C-alpha cells in the first residue's frame, strides 16, 4: 500500500474514532464518580459527567481535592466520558 493510501486509512480511522459515541462500558470508571467540589473554597467553574442524565454539567470546583470527574471544559468532558 502506498504512503498516501496509508495516510488516508489513518485519517479515516481517526475520524471514525472521534465520531463513534462512547458507550457506558467504554467510559473510564471515574466518569461515574459523583460530582465533588473539593475541600477548598475557590470558585472555579468546571464540568463533570452525570451518568443519570448522560450529560456534562457545570459545577463550582473549590480548587483542591475532589475527584477525577472534573474537567476544565465541556468539550473535554464530552471527549472523555461522552454525553451531551
Curated annotation (Swiss-Prot):
Give the matching SMART domains.
Answer: KU
Q: What PROSITE patterns does UniProt report for this protein, alphabetically?
A: BPTI_KUNITZ_1, BPTI_KUNITZ_2
- The reply on keyword Calcium is no
Site feature: Reactive bond for trypsin = 41-42
Q: Which cysteines are joined by disulfide bonds?
A: 31-81, 40-64, 56-77
Q: Name the InterPro entries for this protein.
A: Kunitz_BPTI, Kunitz_BPTI_sf, Prtase_inh_Kunz-CS, TFPI/VKTCI-like
Residues in domain BPTI/Kunitz inhibitor?
A: 31-81
Q: Where in the cell is it found?
A: Secreted
> Per its UniProt entry, which superkingdom is the organism in?
Eukaryota
Q: Which residues carry this modification: Pyrrolidone carboxylic acid?
A: 25
Alphabetically, the GO molecular function entries are: serine-type endopeptidase inhibitor activity
Alphabetically ordered keywords of this record? Disulfide bond, Protease inhibitor, Pyrrolidone carboxylic acid, Secreted, Serine protease inhibitor, Signal
According to UniProt, the tissues expressing it are described as: Expressed by the venom gland.
Tell me yes or no: is Signal among this UniProt entry's keywords. Answer: yes
Which chain regions cross the lipid bilayer? none
**GO CC terms, sorted:** extracellular space
Say which family it is in: Belongs to the venom Kunitz-type family.
User: What does it do?
Assistant: Serine protease inhibitor.
- For this entry, the protein name equals Kunitz-type serine protease inhibitor 4
Question: Which organism is the protein's source?
Answer: Daboia russelii (Russel's viper)
- Organism lineage: Eukaryota, Metazoa, Chordata, Craniata, Vertebrata
Amino acid at each position: 500500500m502506498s504512503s498516501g493510501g496509508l495516510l488516508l486509512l489513518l485519517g479515516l480511522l481517526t475520524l471514525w474514532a472521534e465520531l463513534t459515541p462512547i458507550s457506558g462500558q467504554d467510559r473510564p470508571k471515574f466518569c461515574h464518580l459523583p460530582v465533588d467540589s473539593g475541600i477548598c473554597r475557590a470558585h472555579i467553574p468546571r464540568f463533570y459527567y452525570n451518568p443519570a442524565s448522560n450529560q456534562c454539567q457545570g459545577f463550582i470546583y473549590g480548587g483542591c481535592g475532589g475527584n477525577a470527574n472534573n474537567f476544565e471544559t465541556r468539550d473535554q468532558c464530552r471527549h472523555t466520558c461522552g454525553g451531551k
